[in-house]
Amino acid sequence: MKEMRNLTILLALLFSFFVVGNVDARHYKSKRKATTHRVVKKKKHVRKRRVIVRPPTIHENPYLQCEDTCSHVHGIDLSHYQGDVFWETVGENTRTAYVYLKATEGGDRIDDRYERNIDLAHRHGLKVGSYHFFRPRTDLTQQMKNFRAQCLPGEQDLIPMLDVESTGGLSNEEFCDSLSKFLLMMEEVYHQKPLIYTGRNFYNKHLLGMVDDYLLMIAMYTDEEPVLADERDICLWQYTGRGRINGVVGHVDKSRFMGQHGLRELRFRH
């Protein structure tokens, strides 16, 4: 009897251990599932930004030339700084319609490439004009003689141009007086008003109201067309001093007509 009671107690204990073990196992599995459950994050909707690609400008891309991007009439100006020019190659460029050549500077300086340049430029079909670099403090009569000896009317297709870039240390009143007298001398010698070349900033500072009767070539090396302080009309815009053209080694100054202006306005009247 005693043995039966002990066996019963032993079976009861084994049963209780079995039941508790199953409960703990189920609890462990449930807990494990809860802790290892994968959390899927909701994707955020990202709005795509539209990117507008702007074509490079001539000042950002050295291989892109202004004449490649517009329909204006273009030209160049040259001096001895460009060395030997291959004029046949330059003449084959159908987008280069004219060239201004440096002839003289001050009272006695002569560009040593001028004679060769003007001869070959004519031979290869370019419309040619000549320019003088003005020195306000130098004797005006001597400057005029120097320019006239080189810039022969019979060799000109375009009106002469005066390059004005410095006051020479004169007061603005003295400078403007010197310039006005020289412009009149050029007009008397060539029987037509010259073209004036200058920079936008120089014009705004020194020439406002002084050269209203003359056509202007304005130098400003930006992507925006120049606008003068008095908003006067501009005939030509020199838009770069670092242009390139087949036939010229290195950089070259390039210009183009503004608005409705054209070569007919610069034609030398013989």
Question: What do the PLM-derived regions correspond to, one by one?
Answer:
Residues M1-I9:
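Bacterial N-terminal signal peptides that target proteins for export
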Residues L10-F18:
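Bacterial N-terminal signal peptides
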Residues P62, D68-G83, G91, L101-L183, ...:
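Substrate-binding cleft of extracellular glycoside hydrolase catalytic domains
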Residues L158-E231:
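Catalytic domains of cell-wall/extracellular-matrix polysaccharide-remodeling enzymes
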